[in-house]
Amino acid sequence: MFGLIGHLTSLEQARDVSRRMGYDEYADQGLEFWSSAPPQIVDEITVTSATGKVIHGRYIESCFLPEMLAARRFKTATRKVLNAMSHAQKHGIDISALGGFTSIIFENFDLASLRQVRDTTLEFERFTTGNTHTAYVICRQVEAAAKTLGIDITQATVAVVGATGDIGSAVCRWLDLKLGVGDLILTARNQERLDNLQAELGRGKILPLEAALPEADFIVWVASMPQGVVIDPATLKQPCVLIDGGYPKNLGSKVQGEGIYVLNGGVVEHCFDIDWQIMSAAEMARPERQMFACFAEAMLLEFEGWHTNFSWGRNQITIEKMEAIGEASVRHGFQPLALAI
């Protein structure tokens, strides 16, 4: 059995979704209530592969909200993630994906050192961040968008915002070794990590955000949007493709203009409908088929019987792992969300 551990994007959305899903006792509550609310299994899921194989899973709502980080309730945030993981393990779930901010919290707050959750010793091989599949899907989206717009990827400039992160660094490796992009621009906050990534790749131009964006034919955004940052569409190339790989996805509402294309990055579409409620809450265009690639990774690991923490740690994603999960993705009927023009 697979599990999907996730959360909603805001207190306002949490109230709305609770009301729609019949959790009336949650619908009118504030942050204090959500801070103490335990994890809940709120969806039972059945997925059929293109091969005909059928698997079953559960969606675990962690009851974490981003406002907890904004209010500097870091202990609350870490407790939410650990409790959700413990809940999944107690229910016998073999492999669970840490979706949204849950994997970021796990890494940034070093939760690997907090293996004991009350009477449960977490078995980390039961969990995956899903970042390998996410990185693979984003790279395929860049490749497909280039073909759609008639852009020669080997002559194109790709800027990766958040290049030193787990997903960002994997994307950079694939763009360099598999796609052979013309120019690669690396943008991130940590200069030392940028220097190390540039040395590893043997290429890549390090630029601040405001200098990087106007040079790029493709912008892969896999970082949180800094407060106060405004992207002027007039400064971007035409055409310019922005792959929004963050969560929540909001570049589409912030960057609009002639010749500017925004694509939800790290989203896949399955070949068959899935009877579930949670992707409607994620505001997918086709919630019965579309999902985050990190969630799909847990399904793929279940389909393949790979019950292991396939994506784990920071900057451990290899080209070989991306190829392996990519082959499984195709085999079981997933395809990257395509650019609509």
Curated annotation (Swiss-Prot):
Q: Keyword set for this entry?
A: NAD, Oxidoreductase
Q: Cofactors per UniProt?
A: a divalent metal cation
* UniProt keyword Oxidoreductase present: yes
Gene3D superfamilies for this protein: NAD(P)-binding Rossmann-like Domain (3.40.50.720)
What reaction(s) does this enzyme catalyze?
a long-chain fatty aldehyde + holo-[ACP] + NADP(+) = a long-chain fatty acyl-[ACP] + NADPH + H(+); a long-chain fatty aldehyde + holo-[ACP] + NAD(+) = a long-chain fatty acyl-[ACP] + NADH + H(+)
What's the Enzyme Commission number for this chain? 1.2.1.80
Q: Looking at the keywords, is NAD present?
A: yes
Query: Which SUPFAM superfamilies did the record assign?
Result: NAD(P)-binding Rossmann-fold domains
- Entry superkingdom: Bacteria
Molecular function in Gene Ontology: oxidoreductase activity
Q: Which family does it belong to?
A: Belongs to the short-chain dehydrogenases/reductases (SDR) family.
Q: What does this protein do?
A: Catalyzes the NADP-dependent reduction of long-chain acyl-ACP to the corresponding fatty aldehyde. Involved in the biosynthesis of alkanes, mainly heptadecane and pentadecane, by producing the fatty aldehydes used by aldehyde decarbonylase.
Under PANTHER family, the record lists:
NADP-DEPENDENT 3-HYDROXY ACID DEHYDROGENASE YDFG (PTHR43086:SF3), VERY-LONG-CHAIN 3-OXOOACYL-COA REDUCTASE (PTHR43086)
Name of the featured protein? Long-chain acyl-[acyl-carrier-protein] reductase
- Organism of derivation: Synechococcus elongatus (strain ATCC 33912 / PCC 7942 / FACHB-805)
